[in-house]
Amino acid sequence: MRVRKRKLPKKFWAFKSKNLILTFGKSLILPVVVFVIFSLNGNALALSKDGKIRTVVIDAGHGGKDPGAMGKTIAEKRITLAVALKVGEYITKNHPDTKVIYTRNDDHFVELYRRADIANKNKADLFISIHCNASKSRIHYGAETFVMGLHRSQANLEVAKLENAAVLYEDNYQSQYDGFDPNAPEAEILFSMYQNLYRRQSLLLASNIQNQLNAVASRFDRGVKEAGFLVLYRTTMPSVLVELGFISNENEENFLKSKAGQEKLALAIAN
């Protein structure tokens, strides 16, 4: 990210002075747990009746005043929007009975928590958040798909930090996300429920997307991973965050911004 005029408080960034931290405070964990139990049980029952996917929410990362990661010639927000809209078009064409909802369908800013709210209020069966990766090293390449979980590696943490930095554009981010720490002991309660209710479906969705990105879009497969993404932790359905490729890599940037590349990426996700 090239924008950072405001800095997050230390509790938002530092765990032993290095890791991104948004703490699951004791005051928050119980209401969140209760909310998730009731919300997820309802959604799980709906999915178990016939297994049909009736509503999919497609989330184009960043937007408006938040450009996302910057390539040499294009901002992440433009790529994610183009691909997200194409994903929706493919789903509508091939699965006319499935309703597609976008968290944004033009270049405007949407807070991370509102993206999850859109999915929850519409009782979505799937939530797919679309992003582009970036690295200080321009040699990194490939696609990877994340599910909500613990920061099991420094690399996963860095990706989460990159995407979570979108909160810097939100006026009330300190109060809105106070209490979020995927690595806090209290979080095990939430992740335990997550695993029992829809983590398995999220992993299955992520695995399918990765396979298709490799087969259809010829993307190097960086695998299915988990990390603490703010945009995922409030969703009450199977949800994934897709990193299409590295916008910091010139070759991948050229593919990501090309019409042909976007068509292939969208088709892979929609499959």
What are these regions (language model features)?
Residues 177-185, 241:
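Flexible hinge/switch segments at interdomain interfaces of large molecular machines
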Residues 25-39:
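Bacterial N-terminal signal peptides
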Residues 1-23:
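N-terminal secretory signal peptides that target proteins for export/translocation
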Residues 44-180, 195-207, 211, 263, ...:
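Catalytic-core regions of hydrolytic enzymes
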Residues 150-164, 182-190, 224-232:
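A short, terminal or domain-edge coil/loop segment
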Residues 18-20, 28, 40, 240:
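Compositionally biased regions
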Residues 11, 41-43:
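Short, intrinsically disordered, low-complexity terminal segments
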Residues 68, 187-271:
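Active-site-adjacent mobile loop/cap segments within catalytic or ligand-binding domains
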